[in-house]
Amino acid sequence: MNAQVSFLDGTYTLIHIPLNLYSTLLQPILRVLLPQSQSQGNLRDSPEYELQGLTSDGQHGFLNISITPLECSVVCHSSWAQNVFEPVLKTLPRDVAKSVSVSKDSYMILSVISAGLDAGGRVMELTSPLALAGIPIFFITTYYSDFILVPTKERDNVAKSLLAKGFELCENESNYVTQGYKKGATQPPVTPPHEGLPSNVSEMQKNTFGLLKKRHVTPHIEEGLVLVQCSGREASQLASFNHQRPSISRHTTGNGRRPSWADNVDTKLYTCIISALVSQPRFMSVTLAQDDPPSLLLDKNLLDVFGDSLVGDTEGCLIPIFLNLESLSLEATGIVCGVAGILVQDPQIAESSELSYLSTAQAGAVILSDEQSVRAMGILEPLLTKEP
């Protein structure tokens, strides 16, 4: 596998919102989605003023908002969690606010750009070294890239694990590159596992399914829910759509003020995203990353809301298999690797180009084609069903 892995700047927070509080917390969700709504009074006019977690043109370094049949989950820069969500939570009755979970530990995000490996193999290649090192992760597959959330406190262990797997440290110490394994090539020695950690992937998978079974985690498919994976348009495509608009300097606009966030985005797409969010969709996951156009995994029934603002295979039919992980702590390890590893042992699933994974705060979803989802349920159900 040819892959480039890099740490994104900043630290991030994971937020779980119960579905019955979604409408209550929709306003802070939209404030995070639309950065210009984060008002700081006159400070906004200061040329040196920049909101944390945003690029120079006002875009999020990373943001994921996911609404599923199990929960609403938000991954945002820690400053946004502190300055936008936490003040709202303090206004709620204590017993209500307690049902919202804001991660105490911060996370780093690894951005992965890879080629030359099937989808299932890619998930395994990226997650297995971290799982074997006892590092808890959250995995988000998007239209263009894979993103892995790891605890900030585990940064050194992440680096060691990647190096041991054959990733090479680039001049920029935040980047790792691997060219895959070559027959006969010497690999860095792997440190023996710490006490209590699995020594190989098979042992890790056994531990994972033992834990899931003990916590009564069972796979399920939501009847009638079909997803599509799409993207917003590339910047070059947007330029052709908006060729009549004057060029915008990132320092000032024609009226002497700094350009707003809206000057640099596809406002039609964002209007559609807001419309879908306001409707409390059955399923929608939006990922914004600074080097990619917006990526959306959404209920196929929402396509009419978006019109021609999306690109991608809108005729596809992807089925999510949900795992409710609310009984597990955020420190649980090996879930993504364990589940994906079992599935890719099936030859047909292993060859599928459509296997992906979405981690949310308290759940996980394996996403496959319609046919492969049936095979996957046939594999997972016997492993996670307790004998009478």
Task: Give the location of each predicted region.
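A conserved regulatory-domain signal marking ACT and ACT-like small-molecule sensing domains
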Residues: 1-388
